[in-house]
């Protein structure tokens, strides 16, 4: 049976339908707003695999090319590996729903969101977030939903829910929020140095906006009436748990206070091994359970120590930032480079400048576009003392890179003022928490080292949360273990003036306004401290580019002269690049960017282009080349492709019988422009140029 519900979200109608398509899935909905439609399915296997120790949730998001009336541009003409945008949308769907499954539900579960129709004004990613929740709500899969997503923008001081493409262009912030009826579950976005108070208002504006969508999902679930699966409660061996606690608790109290990560992990592993050995005879085959109870002990002890004593794993209080060291110009041949170290987290970051040919081509639902700023984040296994087989970057690397890219993009100069393609690469060389924020700091330093005139330095910090009942502690600059054992990972990046990017994920049922406000305020204090540490090394962009970076000079020509620059079949522009070795980019407005690491080559290219587009001026002297001898005079080329006639009467002060007595083809001759007729024909005189000196 087909069931349909509708919700109004700030003037836009969202329709959710189930029971018509993909009926063999555990749950399936078609969600629509405007002309954008997404099919979202949820399937969970009937039982968990034997020995399954984690929740295997997979989220897939795919944009079908036909949804935008396009044929894929790849060689095979079909959809292939996910684009970065599809990968990022998968993460947006996954992160708010993952904490809402029961802890003991370990069945293979897959969410698939397929964009089947798309307009430019209704974001399919937002609809996919809502659709994933709705598909789970109408299924028999246990899920503590609903949740809903919304994108918030601000134009002329007014907040807008799910802005159109035109409104997004004018907006000074873009934040995606996922929320339940009572709390915020996830936040991600960027802003143009917006204050913490304004961000908080935007987030809770979004929370209010999604309430009708949440109500519609509850209505749909009620209409469908599917009963949820019964999940057996986990059986806990209380006797074993008590024995593990008795044997290991005192040792664990000391181990969790060891300040260095490797030594701490070795100590905890040693306690686990000793406990397994001590209990192996009494509780045969219980090694996995024993190690699970050791992990529970670590979880409880770390959190208790923070809540009761205000002291963290490495001895810091809740607000202290780890020691920071910075270095720039680390790599002599890179255009800009930095080494950023914060505690046991370290990143080498390099900035490279390129031209328009280096722009990334993006093939999307809405057509081709070009990307002029890229940040790539790499997390090699050695950074955490591990080994693995590395192929393409994973979802986490793409997500962390995009967060850092958004943070830095807000301070870039306008492309007209700095017409370079910029690529930042961050290689994490050590990691113990907050490597994406180390990338932001290192990226800012490397751009300043490269001489990119950024608006202001940017720093980032990761905040954590430990919440027990009504008590909570907010942690600045979290360690990896604090991320793992805590309830929130809240990354905030920005300048001294305001926030440029943020991302919040939680592992509990939601966070309140009070917690978010306190976290943002504490993050600001931490960010200002980090900016101060960075400024000790470099506080503003260098005044010049690296000697190894291309110099781009911009000149303009009249639009009707573009064809003269290019020439037939590209002949003219090719002759310039071959003669000078420069890279030239021409757009249809007459703007020409000339790039070269050699100033002399660039100057020569400019001169050659000026010659190609130059127009004769009456009364001006020109050094020309005789192209053709006629009985009535000689044709002299004064610019490439532009010549004029020197009539026989204008060859000399005395009467000339034969033109060839004075000039021959190929001769260089100084002439003066004495007129241009209505047809644009140029009249030249050698006679009037005699005795004059030519200067370019």
From Swiss-Prot:
Localisation per UniProt entry: Cytoplasm
Record-stated family: Belongs to the polyribonucleotide nucleotidyltransferase family.
Top EC class, one word: transferase
Organism: Citrifermentans bemidjiense (strain ATCC BAA-1014 / DSM 16622 / JCM 12645 / Bem) (Geobacter bemidjiensis)
Keyword annotations of the record: Cytoplasm, Magnesium, Metal-binding, Nucleotidyltransferase, RNA-binding, Transferase
The protein's required cofactors: Mg(2+)
One Gene Ontology molecular-function label: 3'-5'-RNA exonuclease activity
Protein name: Polyribonucleotide nucleotidyltransferase
GO cellular component, one term: cytosol
Domain of life (superkingdom): Bacteria
Lineage: Bacteria, Pseudomonadati, Thermodesulfobacteriota, Desulfuromonadia, Geobacterales
Function: Involved in mRNA degradation. Catalyzes the phosphorolysis of single-stranded polyribonucleotides processively in the 3'- to 5'-direction.
Enzyme nomenclature, EC number: 2.7.7.8
Binding-site list for Mg(2+): 483, 489
Every S1 motif domain range: 619-687
Domain KH stretches: 550-609
Reaction catalysed by this enzyme: RNA(n+1) + phosphate = RNA(n) + a ribonucleoside 5'-diphosphate
Gene Ontology biological process terms in this record: mRNA catabolic process; RNA processing
One of the Pfam families matching this protein, by short name: PNPase
HAMAP family associated with the record: PNPase
């Amino acid at each position: 049976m087909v069931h349909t519900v509708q919700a109004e979200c700030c003037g836009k109608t969202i329709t959710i339908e189930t029971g018509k398509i993909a009926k063999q899935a555990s749950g399936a909905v078609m969600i629509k707003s405007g002309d954008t439609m997404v099919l979202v399915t949820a399937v969970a296997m009937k039982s968990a695999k034997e020995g399954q120790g984690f929740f295997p949730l997979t989220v897939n998001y795919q944009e079908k090319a036909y949804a935008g009336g396009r044929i894929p541009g790849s060689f095979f003409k079909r959809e292939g590996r996910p684009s970065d945008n599809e990968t990022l949308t998968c993460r947006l769907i996954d992160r708010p729903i993952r904490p809402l499954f029961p802890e003991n539900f370990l069945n293979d579960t897959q969410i698939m969101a397929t964009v089947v129709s798309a307009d430019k004004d209704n974001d399919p990613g937002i609809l996919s977030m809502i659709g994933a929740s709705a598909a789970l709500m109408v299924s028999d899969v246990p899920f503590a939903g609903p949740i809903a997503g919304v994108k918030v923008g601000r134009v002329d001081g007014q907040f807008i829910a799910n802005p159109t493409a035109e409104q997004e262009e004018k907006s000074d912030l873009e934040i995606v929020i996922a929320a339940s009826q009572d709390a915020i579950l996830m936040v991600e976005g960027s802003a143009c140095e917006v204050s913490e108070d304004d961000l908080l208002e935007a987030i809770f504006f979004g929370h209010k906006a999604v309430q009708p969508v949440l109500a519609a999902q509850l209505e749909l679930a009620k209409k469908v009436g599917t009963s949820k699966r019964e999940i057996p409660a986990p059986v806990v061996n209380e006797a074993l748990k008590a024995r593990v606690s008795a044997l290991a608790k005192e040792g664990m109290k000391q181990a969790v206070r060891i300040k260095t990560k490797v030594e701490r992990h070795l100590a905890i592993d040693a306690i686990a091994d000793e406990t397994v050995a001590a209990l192996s005879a009494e509780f045969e085959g219980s090694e996995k359970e024993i190690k699970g109870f050791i992990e529970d002990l670590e979880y409880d002890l770390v959190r208790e120590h923070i809540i009761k004593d205000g002291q963290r794993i490495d001895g810091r209080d809740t607000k202290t930032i780890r020691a920071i060291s910075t270095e720039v110009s680390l790599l002599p041949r890179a255009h800009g480079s930095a080494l950023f170290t914060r505690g046991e987290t370290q990143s080498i970051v390099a900035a490279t400048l390129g031209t328009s040919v280096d722009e990334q081509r993006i093939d999307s639902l809405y057509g081709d576009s070009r990307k002029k700023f890229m940040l790539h984040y790499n997390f090699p296994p050695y950074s955490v003392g591990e080994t693995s087989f590395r192929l393409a970057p994973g979802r986490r690397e793409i997500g962390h890179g995009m967060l850092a890219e958004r943070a830095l993009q807000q301070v870039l100069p306008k492309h007209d003022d700095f017409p370079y393609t910029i690529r930042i690469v961050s290689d994490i060389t050590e990691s113990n928490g907050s490597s994406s924020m180390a990338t932001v700091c290192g990226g800012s330093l490397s751009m300043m080292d490269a001489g990119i005139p950024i608006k202001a330095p940017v720093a980032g910090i990761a905040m954590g949360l430990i919440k027990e009942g009504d008590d909570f502690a907010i942690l600045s600059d979290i360690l990896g273990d604090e991320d793992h054992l805590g309830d929130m990972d809240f990354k905030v990046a920005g300048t001294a003036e305001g926030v440029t990017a943020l991302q919040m994920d939680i592992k509990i049922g939601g966070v309140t306004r009070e917690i978010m406000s306190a976290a943002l305020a504490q993050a600001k204090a931490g960010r200002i401290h980090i900016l101060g540490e960075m400024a000790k090394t470099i506080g503003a962009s260098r005044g010049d580019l690296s000697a190894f970076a291309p110099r781009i000079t911009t000149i303009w020509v009249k639009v009707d002269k573009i064809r003269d620059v290019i020439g037939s079949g590209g002949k003219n522009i090719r002759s310039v690049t071959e003669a000078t070795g420069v890279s030239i980019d021409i757009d249809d407005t007459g703007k020409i960017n000339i790039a070269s690491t050699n100033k002399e080559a660039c100057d020569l290219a400019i001169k050659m282009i000026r010659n190609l587009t130059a127009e004769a001026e009456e009364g001006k002297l020109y050094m020309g080349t005789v192209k053709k001898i006629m009985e009535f005079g000689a044709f002299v080329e004064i610019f490439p492709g532009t010549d004029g006639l020197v009539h026989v009467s204008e060859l000399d002060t005395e009467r000339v019988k034969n033109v060839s007595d004075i000039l021959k083809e190929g001769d260089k001759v100084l002439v003066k422009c004495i007129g241009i007729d209505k047809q644009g024909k140029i009249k030249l005189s050698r006679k009037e140029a005699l005795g004059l000196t030519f200067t370019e």
